[in-house]
């Protein structure tokens, strides 16, 4: 309970005396009564906020039209009377609209007034007299004038006796409130100076006006004319006020106790410092470290759990021997706890135009990926935050997954931290080691938070498709908590042993393929695919990004080395035939290093590198323009690997007419072997219908996929294998160069396959312009950018019979 003011007993005694029937003090002013006839019309002043009650004595200041004219007219009226009505307006504004005013208000007398005509300002002291009710509006004004009925009948002595239980209940409740809050005492003193508690009507109005009740509740009291009903309503409001005051008192006491304890500790520490200073005692290492930890805490917004844990550890640190091993463990633990940016967040810069400029500056091509990232940022702008989504960038090596993550961090103004989970086999790398182990440390995510010094960085997890598992745990399972927006707000690192909120962190993961990512982990991510680049895009990337980067890296400038577009195109097609641009950058770097030697040998500048000069800089091309394999039983298929799209030649031959075996070579996986057997069975059943000779598929059949050192798997070569076998059965080569992809069933249906975009890019890279694709993949093909699809003739098929007709007629 808060301390009562020294004059509180005087007020409480006055209340008790009134309860016993004592009259007010001799200097109390009796209620005002106007003896002459009451006016039937009153000037109305609309009052915003709380209603004005009879018995109230309040200063009012009015300024400007129409308030000034209203009060001036009231000052000129008989008895200097006017009426105050509360307003219906939701914002509590004073409105000069009769329809916006309540019907019952208070007659007010002007006791004193000070008029400033130049400023149109009046300061007056107003006294509430009695209630009135509007019968009709004479003038809508302003000022508003209304015909009124006065309610000013005094309460009889008989009524006073009947109301005594109600008045005592009100007085007792008021007395309780005074014990908890002394601010009400001044209002009670002012009331006792003019009235006494033996007037139940005045008591009810006074008590209602001093509560913090709503405008509607107070207006209801004002409109209640029977005094007994009015006292009942006032008692209800007073009981509510008592509960509010008790709660406020409790909260204030708790706050004061907390502040007092904090101040006490502060003063004791300051006194200890002064004593040590006077005695010439310098701080030991332990005291200096504890002070340093406490200085860090002043800048942080700790959770209750963290604050309690840190205080416990600091108290423990203060009593441990500095030479003990436990002291070192505890010191390191407190150092980590106080180094984390509790409650420190950077401000997101969610400017879509700026983000688009940064993405376009850092990356050529990838338009669909940029649009998806901009959509993600736009949603974050509308929501006010961009946490809660986990982005997974999937694509071949070298297409710019990591650099896109950096660009996103720059675009939104967040700190960037990257680490690779490829090959990670220990769960403790994610969730930390328990402090009982020697050399224990927090996991990667806590380290990232400490390194970036903010609680909302952008963290990139590279190579999530290559995460491992061992007897030490499964890191992929540990990632489930981190990458789940519903759980990561209470992430618990084993070392920290205190929950830290990771929900504001923006996570971006990268992978080369989805097949090896655990399904529960993949379900938490939003996949954005990055396909490989076509030659024209690579030339632009090399010109705008890779070449300037390698010039700077090797100490050159553009006045010393010039590389033609023809040379860049030849590098791409002859030396760096890949989905990404990493090997392309390596080749440009090799040229730059050789040019650096020539510059120092004082060669004539600038040194120009054309298409015909590449042999002297890079040696013979790694890839030659090979003639496509042609002949009976040979078909080109389309494949999709972790490195991007690729073309795949399939060869078939009848090795003998004896026996009945299908030999498969070329390091094929189980799924591809099954697909080959299905295609072979389908052809054996339908070869005559498709124009082939069944005897050509009897005996021993050998099916080979070249580049035997490269593992191959998947069902997408089904129709390619079937076509190679049909070519063998018809003894007819393919009449033109085309490529195909699609899974085949025993009934000859052609099913959907994945990686359509990557396969189309692979076909363009080797010059194939006619494709056969499953009808079920039409939507995937339509999503391939227009500049990649340009020049292609594509056939969509549902049945293998359509494939045979397209190929052989």
From Swiss-Prot:
It comes from the Bacteria. It is found in: Cytoplasm. Transmembrane segments: none annotated. GO terms for molecular function: ATP binding; ATP hydrolysis activity; ATP-dependent peptidase activity; sequence-specific DNA binding; serine-type endopeptidase activity. It is an enzyme of class 3 (hydrolase). Disulfide bonds: none annotated. Residues 42-242 form the Lon N-terminal domain. InterPro entries: AAA+_ATPase, ATPase_AAA_core, Lon_bac, Lon_bac/euk-typ, Lon_lid, Lon_proteolytic, Lon_Prtase, Lon_prtase_N. ATP binds at residues 395-402. Induction: By heat shock. It catalyses: Hydrolysis of proteins in presence of ATP. One of its GO terms (biological process) is cellular response to heat. One of its GO terms (cellular component) is cytoplasm. Keywords: ATP-binding, Cytoplasm, Hydrolase, Nucleotide-binding, Protease, Serine protease, Stress response. Residues 629-809 form the Lon proteolytic domain. Its EC number is 3.4.21.53. The active site is at 716, 759. ATP-dependent serine protease that mediates the selective degradation of mutant and abnormal proteins as well as certain short-lived regulatory proteins. Required for cellular homeostasis and for survival from DNA damage and developmental changes induced by stress. Degrades polypeptides processively to yield small peptide fragments that are 5 to 10 amino acids long. Binds to DNA in a double-stranded, site-specific manner. Homohexamer. Organized in a ring with a central cavity. Belongs to the peptidase S16 family. This is Lon protease.
């Amino acid at each position: 309970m808060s301390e009562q003011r020294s004059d509180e007993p005087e007020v409480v005694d006055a209340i008790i005396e009134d309860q016993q029937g004592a009259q007010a003090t001799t200097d109390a002013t009796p209620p005002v009564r106007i003896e002459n006839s009451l006016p039937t019309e009153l000037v109305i002043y609309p009052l915003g906020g709380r209603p004005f009650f009879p018995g109230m004595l309040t200063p009012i200041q009015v300024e400007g039209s129409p308030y000034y004219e209203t009060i001036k007219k009231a000052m000129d009226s008989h008895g200097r009377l006017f009426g105050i009505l509360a307003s219906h307006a939701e914002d509590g504004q004073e409105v000069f609209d009769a329809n916006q005013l309540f019907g019952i208000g208070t007659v007010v007398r002007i006791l004193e007034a000070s008029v400033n005509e130049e400023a149109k300002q009046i300061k007056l002291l107003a006294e509430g007299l009695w209630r009135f009710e509007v019968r009709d509006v004479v003038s809508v004004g302003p000022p508003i004038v209304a015909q009124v009925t006065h309610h000013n009948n005094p309460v009889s002595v008989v009524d006073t006796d009947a109301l005594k239980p109600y008045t005592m209940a009100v007085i007792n409740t008021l007395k309780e409130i005074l014990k908890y809050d002394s601010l009400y005492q001044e209002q009670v003193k002012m009331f006792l100076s003019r009235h006494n508690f033996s007037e139940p009507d005045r008591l009810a109005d006074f008590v209602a006006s001093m509560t913090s009740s709503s405008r509607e509740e107070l207006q209801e009291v004002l409109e209640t004319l029977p005094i007994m009903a009015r006292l009942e309503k006032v008692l209800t409001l007073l009981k509510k006020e008592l509960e509010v005051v008790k709660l406020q008192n409790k909260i204030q006491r708790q706050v004061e106790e907390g502040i007092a304890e904090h101040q006490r500790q502060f003063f004791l520490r300051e006194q200890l410092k002064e004593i040590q200073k006077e005695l010439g005692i310098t701080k030991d290492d332990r005291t200096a470290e504890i002070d340093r930890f406490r200085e860090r805490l002043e800048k942080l917004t700790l959770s209750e759990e963290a604050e309690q844990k840190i205080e416990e550890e600091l108290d423990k640190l203060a009593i441990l021997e500095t030479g003990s091993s436990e002291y070192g463990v505890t010191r390191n633990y407190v150092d980590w706890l106080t180094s984390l940016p509790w409650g420190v967040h950077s401000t997101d810069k969610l400017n879509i135009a700026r983000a688009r400029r940064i993405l376009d500056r850092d990356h050529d091509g990838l338009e669909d990926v940029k649009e998806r990232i901009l959509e993600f940022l736009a949603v974050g702008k509308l929501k006010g935050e961009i946490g809660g989504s986990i982005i997974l960038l999937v694509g071949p090596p070298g297409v710019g997954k990591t650099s896109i993550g950096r660009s996103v961090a720059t675009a939104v103004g967040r700190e960037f931290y990257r680490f690779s989970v490829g090959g990670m086999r220990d769960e403790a790398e994610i969730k930390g080691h328990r402090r009982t182990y020697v050399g224990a440390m927090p996991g990667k995510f806590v380290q990232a938070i400490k390194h970036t010094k903010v609680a909302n960085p952008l963290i990139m997890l590279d190579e999530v498709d290559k995460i491992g598992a061992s007897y030490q745990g499964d890191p992929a399972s540990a990632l489930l908590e981190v990458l789940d927006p519903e759980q990561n707000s209470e992430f618990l690192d084993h070392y920290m042993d205190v929950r830290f909120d990771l929900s504001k962190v923006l996570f971006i993961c990268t992978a080369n393929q989805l097949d090896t990512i655990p399904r529960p982990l993949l379900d938490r991510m939003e996949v954005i695919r990055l396909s490989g680049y076509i030659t024209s895009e690579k030339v632009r990337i090399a010109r705008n990004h890779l070449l300037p980067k390698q010039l700077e890296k090797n100490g050159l400038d553009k006045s010393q080395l010039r590389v033609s577009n023809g040379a860049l195109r030849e590098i791409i097609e002859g030396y760096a035939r890949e989905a990404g641009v990493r090997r392309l950058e390596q080749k440009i770097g090799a040229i730059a290093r050789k040019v650096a030697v020539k510059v120092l040998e004082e060669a004539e500048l600038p040194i120009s590198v054309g298409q015909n000069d590449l042999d002297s800089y890079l040696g013979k091309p790694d890839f030659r323009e090979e003639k496509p394999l042609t002949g009976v039983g040979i078909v080109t298929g389309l494949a999709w690997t972790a490195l991007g799209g690729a073309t795949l030649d399939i060869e078939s031959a009848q090795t003998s007419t004896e026996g009945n075996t299908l030999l498969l070579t070329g390091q094929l996986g189980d799924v591809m072997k099954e697909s080959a057997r299905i295609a072979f069975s389908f052809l054996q059943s339908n070869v005559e219908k498709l124009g082939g000779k069944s005897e050509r598929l009897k005996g021993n059949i050998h099916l080979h996929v070249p580049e035997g050192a490269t593992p191959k798997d998947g069902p997408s070569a089904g129709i390619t294998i079937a076509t190679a076998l049909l070519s063998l059965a018809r003894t007819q080569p393919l009449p033109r160069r085309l490529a195909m992809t699609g899974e085949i069933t025993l009934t000859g249906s052609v099913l959907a396959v994945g990686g359509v975009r990557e396969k189309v890019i692979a076909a363009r890279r080797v010059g194939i312009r006619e494709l056969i694709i499953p009808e079920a993949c039409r939507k995937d093909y339509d999503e391939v950018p227009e500049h990649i699809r340009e020049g292609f003739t594509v056939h969509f098929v549902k049945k293998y019979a359509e494939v045979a007709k397209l190929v052989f007629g």
